[in-house]
């Protein structure tokens, strides 16, 4: 059994590739069921955010398991394998463990140290439990990752004042306009990202903000959090009318297809006013063809990289502090995993050797007869037990210390074969 992660992120793939592989929460159960149907995948969990899709799996055969995950990604994204492979990364064993801990800590985020990813890792864990995607190994790994993420945020300052995707989008907007207070601004969507957009827009002086959302209740819940902002709430039916009156539009919905495109924008945007679009959704809410309209400027999540570059520079030292904490958590998981694998074999070997010792001791004592004093029997008992312990001690220490997973498994298999040990493999992972 080995742990592998196959995926892509803002570091390896552009948004036009990431959006094809985005898996909405409503589709997670189907994805987990599909993946667990492959012959070499025992456990699986899926992290899907605007900046990454990562599939963590416990595989019975590393190479074949990775091929199965890659095939799955090709199928759901309708992307040829030859094209997809250039954007994927694959990490195995301890590298996969370390990567998940880094993700949970915000060290792999576009915005270094951002806090939203930890909540997303928690959601992945809960959904994987709910839909029976994970077993003992990944359950422990995700718990370790959540612990690591919490430690990094409580024991370092990396999360203090960290920008988010939403705040980065607002910062980008500020570089494009002189004064937010003089602009009509609309936000399409009323989820967590939209809430953060309102927070940062209000902080930067925006006074005219309209929320466009399908659910009136969700929009009202958002507005209650900002009573001082006097937000205007409208239904999705009025979206294009609102967009036509706006100077800046931020989109943050769960739509799987673009909701703004060249045809519907051309009808409502005036040449005198123009329009700036900031799309922080993946899949994108704004079609690429809007760039053909001279009166429209459109930006997506990949355009935020320049904005967050300064954030990375100022947080590198804090990231180094976080790395040390993460290594402690990686080692804690590795120790647990090593014990999980080695304990059944060691226990079985000790039981077998002890049985042999007792049998041979009994034979020897029976030959010596009843005249052999009881105190002498105790000495021989201690002697044989000491010999067994001395012989087994060093091999067991070396086995537990073996950090290379495949080498450790080869050692275990050799022990099981050489001593004819009957190990129930399921006990190690059940």
UniProtKB/Swiss-Prot annotation:
Q: Tell me which residues bind substrate.
A: 49-52, 109, 114-116, 120
Q: Which InterPro entries match?
A: 4pyrrol_synth_GluRdtase, 4pyrrol_synth_GluRdtase_dimer, 4pyrrol_synth_GluRdtase_N, GluRdtase_CS, GluRdtase_dimer_dom_sf, GluRdtase_N_sf, NAD(P)-bd_dom_sf, Shikm_DH/Glu-tRNA_Rdtase
The EC number(s) given in the record are 1.2.1.70
Quick one: which residues bind NADP(+)? 189-194
Q: Which UniProt keywords apply?
A: Chlorophyll biosynthesis, NADP, Oxidoreductase, Porphyrin biosynthesis
Any idea what job this protein has? Catalyzes the NADPH-dependent reduction of glutamyl-tRNA(Glu) to glutamate 1-semialdehyde (GSA).
The Swiss-Prot or TrEMBL note on domains reads: Possesses an unusual extended V-shaped dimeric structure with each monomer consisting of three distinct domains arranged along a curved 'spinal' alpha-helix. The N-terminal catalytic domain specifically recognizes the glutamate moiety of the substrate. The second domain is the NADPH-binding domain, and the third C-terminal domain is responsible for dimerization.
- Name by which UniProt lists this protein: Glutamyl-tRNA reductase
UniProt source species: Crocosphaera subtropica (strain ATCC 51142 / BH68) (Cyanothece sp. (strain ATCC 51142))
